[in-house]
A protein has these predicted regions:
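OB-fold nucleic-acid-binding modules
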Residues: 60-280
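Short, surface-exposed linear motifs at loops/turns and structural transition points
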Residues: 1-61, 280, 290-300, 310-316
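Surface-exposed loop/turn motifs at beta-strand-loop junctions within extracellular Ig-like
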Residues: 43-47, 145-147, 256, 306
């Protein structure tokens, strides 16, 4: 906006990109609202620095916006849409990034202390490493209209395209209290930590049996199906058993696959009421056998968890039926 012909570009403040990629991004910080600035990209070569064209602008302060108001804007979109202004949002990380029961680069962020729906969203940036932030961190995020995008993705409000360098940690260890809801309210509370009570499952199982493969489990809660999703990256759930139980509770992030509601446990603490602490039979294959009237023989393979030195014990069978344990996992 002013005269930039006399700027000594060799001696101005320079900020290097965090990664040598093309294209690259750099956060320009410390600007004063209302002041005019000139900026240009540069690259360092073996023969010295080379410069791009000069761009000028007047700095303006981002507008503070509540998470609830931003969620309202996001829900009004039908496709990926640039945000309409520079914004600053502040909230509490309510998922557990280190447990990774979410897509890589996902942060679930909610309004501090919120107990009503529409107070959380997803921040998505694959340059954010799981160990960078923790459950209970309070963060402030600057969203630039030139790059940040908003959309409803898998029924959840999501922001992408922001610069990871403009995520500032304000505090840590804040209390995150799940909201007790029913299964039919999961989509309303998308991205928020919730607790479902009166949960039942008739058969024990394993949360995640394969290292790089996601899994889903169907529980019942007050007569409704409750789908529990474990992401392929959630390694803390690998080969961890859960027990058959009536009237337990499960906690996690309210989420969805497309429009089908799911619960995403943030960590093993969220599923502790179904923890298998002793020897547990997790599956029998085949799960059902049928014999002809002339009789017959079938082999059953028993899968267990926490078996240790315990052995399989058989209960008495019906008249004319007998069984024996062959090698502690085969009947």
């Amino acid at each position: 906006t002013g005269d930039v012909t006399n700027i000594d570009w060799a001696n101005v403040a320079k900020t290097k990109a965090q990664e040598k990629v093309s294209p690259w991004t750099v956060a320009v910080t410390g600007l004063t609202s209302g002041s005019q600035y000139a900026v240009r990209a540069y690259a360092t070569t073996s023969t010295g620095d080379i410069y791009g064209s000069v761009e000028t602008f007047t700095a303006s302060a981002p507008e503070a916006i509540s998470i609830a108001d931003l969620v309202t804007k996001i829900k009004a979109t039908t496709e990926v849409t640039p945000i309409d202004n520079d914004y600053i949002i502040q909230g509490i990380i309510c998922g557990d990034p280190e447990a990774q029961n979410c897509s890589y680069g996902t942060l679930y962020v909610m309004t501090k202390g919120a107990t009503t729906a529409g107070n959380a969203l997803t921040l998505y940036n694959t340059t954010i490493k799981p160990e960078t932030y923790s459950l209970g961190d309070e963060i402030k995020v600057t969203l630039r209209k030139e790059s940040a995008k908003m959309q409803v993705y898998n029924s959840a409000p999501q922001i992408s395209g922001f610069d990871a360098a403009e995520v500032e940690k304000i505090s840590s260890g804040n209390n995150v209290q799940p909201v007790t809801i029913t299964v039919d309210k999961l989509l309303d509370f998308a991205c928020m930590p919730v607790k479902i009570e009166n949960v039942t499952i008739e058969t024990a199982g394993i949360w995640k049996t394969e290292v790089d493969k996601a899994s889903t489990h169907t529980f019942k809660a007050n007569g409704s199906d409750l789908t529990v999703y474990i992401n392929k990256g959630a390694n803390s759930f690998n080969n961890v058993a859960y027990i058959a139980k009536e009237n337990g509770s499960l906690t996690g992030i309210a989420a969805a696959y497309k429009t089908s509601a799911q619960l995403l446990p943030r960590n093993l603490e969220d599923v502790k009421e179904f923890e298998a602490t002793g020897p547990t039979i997790t599956s029998v294959a085949p799960s059902q056998v049928n014999f002809p009237s002339t009789g017959g023989e079938e082999t059953l393979i028993i899968s267990t968890s926490n078996q240790g030195s315990s052995t399989l014990q058989l209960s008495p069978l019906g008249e004319g039926i007998s069984a024996e344990v062959i090698d502690n996992n085969t009947v």
